[in-house]
Regions:
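Acidic/aromatic-lined carbohydrate-recognition and catalytic surfaces
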Residues: 319-344
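Carbohydrate-recognition beta-sandwich/jelly-roll modules
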Residues: 1-314
Length: 344
């Protein structure tokens, strides 16, 4: 990687420019960080980390990258950036032990390198969003908006993966520490430059002394696409998380080998009425279970599968427990009597 860093010692915004050695196009960030905090009146404030915003920023260089110490005497905040270069990977790390608060203000969030790799309206490329099966956001005709999607939450962000392709340049971003307190900030057609960008923001009040770390894997020109960015994350999991591919795991597990070939069939047996008419349910007032399938009917389905020549199938029985689906949790036994009970 070829990196140019200017922390804005003259009063201008700091910026970072990164270029893969096999690519003529660089990806840039025009700010070191954005932060939010609660002031002494418990009101949320926000600002950028820059010299012109009153921060003292001290940059040091070594053979592996840069260390940037940031402090603001008036706000009472200080923390340290580590930018580590490892071949074609830029590791951005904020050590948890170096995040300090010395005044009444309390840090709420830190967003390192906001708008890194941002593209403008109409440029060739797209953002990569790891929502459910995956999404691409092209740089055209989007509403001016900022979205914040927490990682591992109900919105479907199932992986700490993000990325961007801009012309012939691209990166795979992986949040490797602090991911459980992270969210992806997605900007579309924003501000006067009509920018598109994606990157992590870390919430601080509930974090468990974890470093805040994101790795940017820069792609060579012929691999600056969403397919190879996905492969990059796959290889990362193999190397660093000891994840074994299914085709290797089935060699030692007959059950898994069977499941890999079998049709999955979900059978819904019993449920309680939804939406709930009785919110606080007890043994005395809980509603009756609505029956969709009894255990006897389940056996009939098994027999029909066999008669139709379906040899491999895995059946998931939903709502077999006491009270059915959304039943008498945490109590699941005995088996629901109206479905046939223990005898069936």
């Amino acid at each position: 990687l070829q990196i140019h860093l200017d922390t804005g010692s003259t009063g201008e915004n700091g910026f970072l420019s990164v270029r893969h050695k096999e690519n003529d196009q660089s990806l840039d960030a025009d700010k070191l960080a954005l932060i939010t905090w609660w002031d002494g009146q418990e009101k949320v404030q926000s600002g950028e980390v820059s010299v012109k915003a009153g921060w003292e920023i001290v940059q040091e260089s070594d053979k592996n990258g840069f260390t940037i110490n940031c402090s603001h005497a008036g706000l009472g905040f200080s923390f340290r950036f580590e930018l580590v270069i490892n071949d074609s990977i830029l590791i951005v790390n904020i050590p948890a032990t170096d995040i300090k608060e010395t005044e009444k203000n309390k840090l709420k969030s830190i967003r390192p390198l906001p708008y890194f790799g941002a593209a403008n309206e109409g440029e060739e490329g797209y953002l990569i969003i790891s929502r459910e099966v995956g999404a691409l956001c092209y740089y055209n005709n989007k509403e001016p908006q900022e979205y914040k999607l927490p990682v591992y939450n109900v919105n479907g962000i199932d992986m700490p993966l993000f990325g961007a392709v801009r012309g012939t340049a691209g990166f795979a971003g992986i949040v490797t520490s602090g991911q459980f307190d992270a969210q992806f900030c997605i900007n579309t057609n924003r501000d006067e430059n009509r920018r598109y960008s994606i990157g992590p923001e870390f919430d601080l009040r509930s974090f468990k002394d974890e470093d805040l770390t994101a790795e940017y894997h820069f792609m060579p020109t012929d691999k600056a696409n969403w397919v190879d960015i996905g492969k990059c994350y796959r290889h990362y999991n193999f190397k660093h998380r000891d994840i074994v591919p299914l085709k290797q795991r089935i060699k030692e597990s007959p059950e898994l080998a069977y499941a890999s070939l079998a049709m999955e069939v979900r059978l819904r047996l019993g449920v309680k009425p939804v939406p709930y008419e009785i919110v606080e349910q007890t043994l005395e007032n809980e509603p009756a279970v609505r029956v969709f399938l009894t255990f006897e009917k389940v056996r009939d389905i098994f027999d029909e599968f066999k008669s139709q020549g379906i040899k491999e199938a895995e059946f998931c029985l939903v709502g077999w427990n006491k009270g059915g689906h959304d039943g008498r949790y945490p109590q699941i036994l005995p088996v629901e009597p109206v479905l046939g009970g223990e005898d069936e």
